[in-house]
Amino acid sequence: MKRLASTAMLVMIVGLLFLPGCGYNAIQGKDEEVKATWAEVENQYRRRYDLIPNLVRVVQAYAKHERETLIGVTEARSKVGQLKIGQDVINNPEQFRKFQQAQGDLTTALSRLMVVVERYPVLKANENFRDLQSQLEGTENRITVARKRYIDAVMEYNKLVRYFPTNLTARFLLHVEVRPTFEAGDEKVKQAPEVKFE
């Protein structure tokens, strides 16, 4: 009995010595980093979403014959608006895929709109349009930066969740899994649209 108690005590002491290396705090820290970078991605996409109605109104005033393109942008924006966005998206690969697809469709629709605008020199000279175009360019750049930061944060988090010994803590203690990230193969989402007016 004494031997069993001393063996149990030895196992507990050895276990306590290795506990700091289990990665619990590291996983928690990386999880918070992923959430923070995701919030920034959401924030930038929301900014773009909010710019679109004003952009469509200005283009609509000058390009009345481009109804199909304007409807395409409005419908793509509507699909993005119907998505449930929040921290749950980064925990659910299917929701993340839908989010990514909707944002990609909106990017494509905006690109088509900018091609249409090229046919209307008076519109390109409009001060309101130039301001909106500048804001859209800046937002697209911020989206690219926010996505890159998110991808980097998810990569670091996923390493912790997959590598030994932190994978044991992730699986058995925290019950967490790898997080989804933007797919590099989806060109229309990976690259910001070229928006130039001269």
Each language-model region and where it sits:
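A helix-centric hydrophobic-segment signal that preferentially recognizes long
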Residues: 2-198
